[in-house]
Amino acid sequence: MKPERRFSRDAILGATEALASQSRPVRFQDVDAAGTIFFPKVYEYFSDAYLDLLLAAGLDVPGSLARRESAAPLVHSEADYLAPLRFGDEVVVEVVLARVGATSTAYAHRILRLDGTVAVIGQTVHVWVSAKTFEPVPVPDALRAYLAGKVGVILD
């Protein structure tokens, strides 16, 4: 996916519905010496919500990996930290936008405090590949069908 195919900050902040959502605490092991979330932990949070989306779409992610059928490695990621998250904060992690191409998917993510403050926004791009050859393969039909018609989804 080319850079211009990613999502604008305004689009991420203004998204009205979540494609996947997960509530969780910021745990002690998630913060750094400054007492705020350690920067790579947000990617773990994004990944967990993304996995929830794939499972909701009916994809057998563990089985597909075990059978070496397909995988969707991350090829791009970015995050903007807008407000601090600290140990003990309760947050909601959302996948709010998606763009589905022939062999790739892009997602926009948000992490919000329970008071509605958006603390982190980010984007990830995944390319679907054969787990055996690592050559690109089409985005699974089940995922494309699940996302079709949802608010915030662009099917290319």
Which residue stretches match the model-derived regions?
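Terminal targeting signals and extreme-terminal segments of soluble enzymes
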Residues: M1-V92, A98-D156
